[in-house]
Structure formats: structure tokens, C-alpha cells
Amino acid sequence: MPYYNKKEYPKQIWVSQIPEREVSLLRENLAGIKQTTFVLMKKEEDFHQLSEKRSRDIIFLSSNQSLLDLARDVDVPAIAYQKPETDTFLHADMVVEGFEEVDMTFLQRVYERHFNIPWTILETERCIVRELELSDLDDLFSMYAEPGMTDYMEGLYEYEEELEYQKAYIENMYRFYGYGTVSYTHLR
């Protein structure tokens, strides 16, 4: 089962001010994805509808910084298209120079990172491997309390300090490196 079927995902992809060649590549990469609607915005005014929509249903792609800023203001995940060899730098959840490799899994990952949803790395009938989230902290402390757990590695900080450390780690490292500390859950 594809990754994007597992959790929340963007139900609409809004696109504005992206070259037609790049839009064609994106459509090609998303061919066969039935659960997501592709919305090609013709006018900037169309974007103001976002404030009336449920932002968790949308991911926005644009090369216009003022529209990307509007997306941020209404809590919509956004991908900036940065034209290659351009001197200006756009700000968004993710910046791309082309859509050759942008597929639904990529969009899903940007969407999840925006809404702080931990990535599922692997799922089988017997286990799930996903990024650590703050709700795992109690289990982490239980695991580290086992005999021999810290014989060859550092232990955890005190609970509140570890909580702050993990918050900062998730906020900064997950976004910067594209992955984070993983958690393994045995299902059977």
C-alpha cells in the first residue's frame, strides 16, 4: 500500500505561477493518484479562498513569495519553485528547482513535516518503524531504565530537560536533515 494512503494527506494541490513544463512533470508524477485534486490557480485572487478552506486539506506550490507568505499565514504547507540560477531565495516548507522527482510521497512528507506528523519509515504486519514523537517519552524512559541499557552509551537527561531536548531536536533536526530519531513498535 502506498505511503500516502496510511495517514492524513493533502486532498488538494494548489499550483500558482509555476512554468507549464514543471506543471506537466508534476501531473505526470501524480498520474493515477485519485484521492488528490489538482487545482491550477489562474489569478492571485483565487488564493484568498484559502482562508475559507480547511488548510489541512491543501498543499500549495508557487514561485511567488507573497503567495507563499500567505500560505504560511493561514497554516498551509507550501513548496516554493525556485527557478534554477536565480539570485533570489524563496522561503517555504520546502524549496525545489524542478518537479522531476516530486511525487505523492514527497508531497506527503512535506505535508507531514509542516503539521509535525512523525514519518512512518517502515510498516509490516509485525512492526512499525517511525520517527520518535514526544508522546513516546515515557516509553523511552522505561526502556532506558532497563539494566545494562546505558553501559555503553549515555543515558537520558532528567524528564523535563529531556522533553525540551527532544522538542528542539524534532523541530530543528527533523526539518534540516529530513529524518529523525526512530521508534520501533512490535505489533505481535
Where do the PLM segments sit?
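Asp-based phosphoryl-transfer active-site loop
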Residues: K7-E20
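Short amphipathic alpha-helix that is part of the acyltransferase structural core
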Residues: L25, I128, E133-D151
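Conserved N-terminal entry element of GNAT/NAT acetyltransferase domains
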Residues: P2-E8, F99-L134
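Conserved GNAT-fold acetyl-CoA-binding loop/helix
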Residues: G148-I170, Y177-Y179
